[in-house]
Amino acid sequence: MADNYVQKSVSLYRDAKNNLYWLFPNNTIERGFYILGLPAKKFDAASTDCMTLIHETLDLMQYCRSVTYDDATQDLKARFKAEVKLWSGSPGLQKASSAVLTIYLTDNEFCIDVFSAKKEERGAYKYTIKRPLEASHEEFAEALNEAFEFYK
């Protein structure tokens, strides 16, 4: 069943409270593993650059291409048991976030959707940054840096 597979879409939060970046895969069933409080990857915001985040995002998208929702859930539970308690779901993380992005691929573009981190706007969509799929990873990292500029 195709709907049971994880989409090639990743949510990226900059967690201001804990000074971390969180990457979450999204799926077609529950709009994202973050609903379950299962983060896929976390990075220290002070020491992680945009190029590293792009490589990790593309790696996570590759992982999502072949894994089913059930398998991924079991894998994430095993890998992140201690971290599950940190955030029980996306609302708490969204409140603490100073950046909320969704990164995904279309047939011919690499896209970053930028959402508001202001409490009164509750994650409202702002705009999309696009690059051709043929672009270099450096160009993808520049696009991510451009997205972070929105939050300054």
Regions found by a protein language model. Give the residues of each.
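Intrinsically disordered, low-complexity regulatory segments enriched in Ser/Thr/Pro
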Residues: A2, Q7-M51, L105-E142, F150
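Residue-level detector of solvent-exposed, low-hydrophobicity positions
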Residues: T28-I29, W87, Q94, A147
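Residue-level detector of alpha-helical secondary structure
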Residues: L58, K81, A141, N145-F148
